[in-house]
Design a protein with these regions (language model features):
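Mid-chain, well-packed structural core segment of small domains
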Residues: 61-64, 68-94
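Residues at alpha-helix boundaries and the short loops/turns that link adjacent helices
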Residues: 16-19, 73, 87, 103
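Short amphipathic alpha-helical segments at helix boundaries and their inter-helical linkers
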Residues: 36, 73-79, 100-115
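Short alpha-helical scaffolding segments that buttress acidic/His motifs in well-ordered protein cores
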Residues: 40-44, 61-68, 96-101, 112
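Acidic, glycine/proline-rich low-complexity segments that act as flexible tails and inter-domain linkers
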Residues: 1-57, 85, 110-126
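Gly/Ser/Thr-rich helix-start
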Residues: 19, 47, 66, 72, ...
Length: 126
């Protein structure tokens, strides 16, 4: 049986995050972690990321802001890369992180800037 929502999600996930990122995510899948990868691909990427209310660039920038607030650095790096893939500029990412400073606090924003700098190529420690 074909799962069209999963297939659409997988295509969207690859479009946003890149083929290599998705391949690495699935390379580490075990019987235990398979359900969460399927859930993410099917529901986040196959449903929410497919909705018409926001373009992909805006969705990516919103995701960067939320991951900054949550302090999820590993996920943040992937989604900064995704935002760039979706047409966001380095300046837009920088502004999202600076804006997050006001609402999330300086420590969270400093960590987010460090993670984002690794992706955008300005990786000197600050």
């Amino acid at each position: 049986m074909s799962d069209d929502q999963f297939e659409r999600g997988l295509a969207m996930r690859k479009q946003v995050m890149g083929e290599d990122f998705v391949a690495r995510a699935y390379a580490g899948v075990t019987d235990f972690t398979a359900p969460i990868q399927t859930h993410i691909t099917r529901n986040a990427w196959g449903d929410v990321w497919q909705r018409p209310g926001l373009d992909l660039q805006t969705r990516s920038l919103v995701t960067v802001a939320m991951l900054t607030a949550l302090g999820k650095q590993h996920e943040l790096e992937g989604h900064v890369r995704g935002a760039l893939n979706n047409g966001a500029t380095v300046q837009e990412i920088q502004e999202v992180l600076l804006h997050a400073t006001v609402y999330c606090g300086v420590p969270a924003a400093v960590e987010a800037f460090r993670s984002a700098a690794e992706v955008v190529g300005a990786g000197e420690a600050g």
